[in-house]
UniProtKB/Swiss-Prot annotation:
It holds the Pfam family EF-hand_7. This is Myosin light chain alkali. GO terms for cellular component: muscle myosin complex. InterPro entries: CALM/Myosin/TropC-like, EF-hand-dom_pair, EF_hand_dom. Myosin is a hexamer of 2 heavy chains and 4 light chains.
Amino acid sequence: KKEKEQGCYEDFIECLKLYDKEENGTMMLAELQHALLALGESLDDEQVETLFADCMDPEDDEGFIPYSQFVQRLMSDPVVFD
């Protein structure tokens, strides 16, 4: 796909900032999971778990993850589903 169709890093970050209530570059892992399941390309639970395993830093004690690293990893090495 063309880059325009896939979106760019800044577009993804702007969308995820909507969930960043503390404005500190983190969001709840559960909110990211919900967004991936409910919005955009429809992914199933197994696909979301694969994304998290491949691209995600561990969540902190309060359940937050740094979303910019997730997007960077996802875009630099896309996960392909059959």
